[in-house]
Amino acid sequence: MIPGEIKTDSGDRELNVGRPRIKIKVANAGDRPIQVGSHYHFYEVNNALKFDREATKGYRLDITSSTAIRFEPGQEREVTLIPYQGSRTVIGFQGKVQGVLS
């Protein structure tokens, strides 16, 4: 075994099993690509991304940890989001929440 190595069973893994999900259409109205990371509070992403922002409060992308989705200028796509778990405290990002989600 290599130090830090993690051995797992073979096969694919399903992420966030049993978690509620929402799908939302997102469009990049800006003139530059925008990349959003796996754990970024979607409600607080770049303002050039157009979507029903209020519906995404307390949600993040349903993608593998440490990965991201890139939105090219003019691109529209549907993304899947999952709610934050645990204490549901959101601090940082654009500073729009700064505390516990309701």
From Swiss-Prot:
CDD domains with a match to the protein in the record: Urease_beta
HAMAP family: Urease_beta
Matches recorded under InterPro entries: Urease_beta-like (IPR002019), Urease_betasu_sf (IPR036461), Urease_subunit (IPR050069)
Organism: Alteromonas mediterranea (strain DSM 17117 / CIP 110805 / LMG 28347 / Deep ecotype)
Annotated compartments: Cytoplasm
Gene Ontology MF terms in the entry: urease activity
Record-stated family: Belongs to the urease beta subunit family.
SUPFAM superfamilies: Urease, beta-subunit
Catalytic class of the enzyme: hydrolase
EC numbers: 3.5.1.5
Superkingdom field: Bacteria
Catalytic reaction annotation: urea + 2 H2O + H(+) = hydrogencarbonate + 2 NH4(+)
Pathway the protein acts in: Nitrogen metabolism; urea degradation; CO(2) and NH(3) from urea (urease route): step 1/1
NCBIfam families linked: PRK13203.1 (NF009682), urease_beta (TIGR00192)
Major subcellular location class: cytoplasm
Keyword annotations from UniProtKB, A to Z: Cytoplasm, Hydrolase
Quaternary state and interactors: Heterotrimer of UreA (gamma), UreB (beta) and UreC (alpha) subunits. Three heterotrimers associate to form the active enzyme.
The protein's name in its UniProt record: Urease subunit beta
Gene Ontology biological process terms from the UniProt entry: urea catabolic process
A cellular component term, taken from the record's GO annotations: urease complex
Pfam family, one: Urease_beta
